């Protein structure tokens, strides 16, 4: 029972509070609200599908929906019925996969969950992430299932193969029953951790399939003032479905003193609806200051000297090097102030720095074998009130087939 009257803390005080609420709602003739206190929400039990249920079905396709609730003030748990499947859910999926020619599993959830076992079940043809779309979500879901609308969404989280692949999983509060949680992930949050530490996820950040295929080609990168511009041509190479693609631009910072992850998302943009064979040219833009790192020593954001590798693709794990921007010297982009100094030092996680630098540059070496790299030098056109140093130069290297 998760009602307020039986929650944590002083039971009598909480019961008195609820009693007052009941009296108040009764006085105002709002009986439905009072009933809610007597009957708090409880997750429904998973229904077991039987062969009798299947016998009345005359279709060759089954759609099985897995639901998980989400909300504020409630941690997720690595347990059945939350992060993991209920035993009944596993049994239902196995049965449906054996009986039906096609099985689609829909995830009506607000966060990640363990899909490794589900992916291993032979006969699961598709997994559709519906998330929580609101009161009209059913209409949107049906449009996608029948092909009226082509899905074009991308994952905003990294879906791990195993719960323990998440860096905080071993020390999260409910695992050790601690009162204080030491945040030791540092800058390695989400895909930054998986990419930098070489942990292969089940589904990477920015992942999402379509009923059609797309070809993404990056053009000549340019720099205007502080703005980096990446022209990209996107073509629907499929023959049946129209669709949209999300082009993603990442950068890898190399050669600096401050620690940096393997790559970070700089900008993304969704195309218009493209018919089979149709092409669209878009220009993705972002400010160079976005690539700066915070220095506690200087109490400032610094765009460090070094190479900044620009990668273009449709997910964090599917990109190609489009060019390299060389920053010739350190640039202070914003002066700040250190606040809330730590009372206890954090033992933050760190990847192998040497291997990480090699990984960042690995794709460049492969690209150099087949591409010529002309170098252009750009002088920043800065406003007087711009905090960047006006004497700095950006040297741009771009790849031309």
Language-model features and meaning:
Residues 1-12:
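Single conserved hydrophobic/aromatic residue that forms the stacking wall/gate
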Residues 13-41, 108-244, 250, 305, ...:
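Secreted, periplasmic, or luminal enzymes acting at the cell surface/secretory milieu
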Residues 67, 97-101, 146-150:
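Sec-exported extracytoplasmic/periplasmic mature domains
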Residues 81, 123-131, 167-168, 172-177, ...:
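Short beta-alpha connecting loops at secondary-structure transitions
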Residues 334-335, 342, 361-401:
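Intrinsically disordered, low-complexity regulatory regions in eukaryotic proteins
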């Amino acid at each position: 029972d998760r009602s307020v009257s039986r929650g944590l803390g002083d039971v009598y005080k909480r019961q008195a509070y609820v009693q007052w609420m009941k009296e108040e709602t009764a006085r105002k003739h709002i009986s439905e609200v009072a009933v809610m206190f007597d009957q708090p929400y409880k997750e429904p039990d998973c229904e077991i599908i039987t062969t009798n249920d299947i016998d009345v079905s005359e279709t060759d396709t089954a759609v099985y929906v897995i639901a998980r609730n989400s909300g504020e003030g409630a941690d997720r748990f690595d347990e059945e019925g939350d992060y993991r499947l209920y035993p009944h859910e596993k049994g239902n999926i196995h049965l449906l996969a054996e009986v039906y020619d096609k099985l689609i599993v829909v995830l009506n959830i607000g966060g990640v969950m363990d899909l490794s076992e589900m992916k291993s079940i032979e006969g699961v043809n598709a997994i559709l992430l519906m998330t929580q779309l609101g009161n009209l979500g059913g209409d949107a879901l049906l449009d996608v299932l029948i092909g009226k609308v082509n899905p074009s969404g991308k994952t905003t989280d990294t879906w791990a193969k195993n719960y323990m692949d998440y860096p905080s999983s071993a020390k999260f509060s409910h695992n050790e029953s601690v009162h204080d949680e030491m945040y030791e992930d540092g800058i390695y949050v989400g895909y930054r951790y998986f990419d930098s530490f070489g942990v292969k996820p089940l589904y990477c950040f920015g992942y999402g399939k379509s009923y059609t295929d797309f070809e993404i080609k990056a053009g000549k990168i340019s720099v205007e003032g502080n703005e980096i511009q990446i022209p990209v041509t996107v073509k629907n190479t499929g023959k049946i479905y129209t669709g949209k693609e999300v082009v993603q631009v990442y950068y890898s910072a190399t050669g600096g003193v401050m620690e940096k992850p393997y790559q970070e998302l700089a900008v993304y943009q969704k195309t218009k609806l493209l018919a089979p064979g149709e092409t669209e040219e878009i220009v993705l833009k972002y400010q160079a200051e976005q690539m700066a790192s915070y220095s506690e020593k200087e109490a400032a954001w610094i765009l460090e000297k070094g190479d900044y590798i620009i990668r273009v693709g449709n997910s964090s794990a599917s990109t190609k090097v489009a060019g390299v921007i060389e920053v010739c010297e350190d640039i202070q982009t914003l002066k700040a102030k250190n606040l809330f100094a730590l009372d206890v030092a954090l033992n933050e996680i760190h990847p192998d720095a040497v291997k990480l630098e090699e990984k960042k540059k690995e794709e460049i070496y492969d690209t150099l074998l087949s591409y010529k790299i002309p170098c252009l030098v750009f002088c920043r056109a800065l406003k007087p009130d711009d905090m960047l140093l006006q004497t700095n130069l950006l040297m741009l290297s771009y790849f031309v087939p």
